[in-house]
A protein has these predicted regions:
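Non-catalytic interaction-recognition regions
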Residues: 1-177
Length: 177
């Protein structure tokens, strides 16, 4: 067996905590050091942290390229512009956040938050990847400020939820990787 302090020394407290919280409290834990240090989607803490860092980067870029004054109004006002399947999936997942937190608290099952954050990160990465392949689906669309603001509202909500979720789990969100 390995002592928890040795695990923390090897991978860091945030990684150790997240990996532990991806298991039910009555389930055995097999800690895979290689996976915990991997920088890929197979490492849930990296995947979630990377989504937060990407969202931070996208919003920082938007501040330099767009006038973000009043952009808080756009989520509801221009919701009808979010037509892509990945956008709608992200909206549905974002809407689940309050129920996830309540369920995790009532049932004393913090792994629900960790699972949800991983799902949210996956959905966000899929949407971002679609924009890399096809410029039509990028978050920031020159000449289409309404659509850009609607998409940036999704980015802002995703970043906010990941940040709050990680903090609830006692993990510090990263803004750059």
């Amino acid at each position: 067996f390995i002592l928890l302090k040795d695990v923390i020394n090897e991978v860091g407290a945030d990684i150790a905590r997240f990996v532990m919280l991806t298991r039910k409290n009555d389930a055995p834990l097999d800690f895979d050091f290689d996976k915990a240090l991997e920088q890929s989607k197979d490492n849930p803490v990296f995947y979630v942290q990377y989504a937060h860092a990407r969202a931070s980067s996208i919003l920082a870029k938007a501040e330099t390229e767009l006038d973000l004054e009043g952009s808080k109004k756009f989520l509801l006002k221009h919701f009808n512009l979010l037509l892509q399947m990945e956008e709608r999936s992200l909206v549905r997942l974002i809407a689940l956040w309050p129920k996830i937190v309540e369920s995790a608290a009532v049932k004393r099952e913090p792994h629900r938050i960790a699972f949800y954050l991983n799902d949210l990160a996956s959905c966000f990465h899929a949407l971002q990847h679609k924009g890399k392949i096809n410029p039509e689906f990028r978050f920031i669309r020159v000449g289409q400020s309404d659509l850009s603001f609607a998409r940036l509202s999704l980015v802002r909500a995703t970043k906010s939820i990941i940040s709050k979720g990680l903090l609830l789990l006692g993990i510090n969100p990263v803004h750059r990787m």
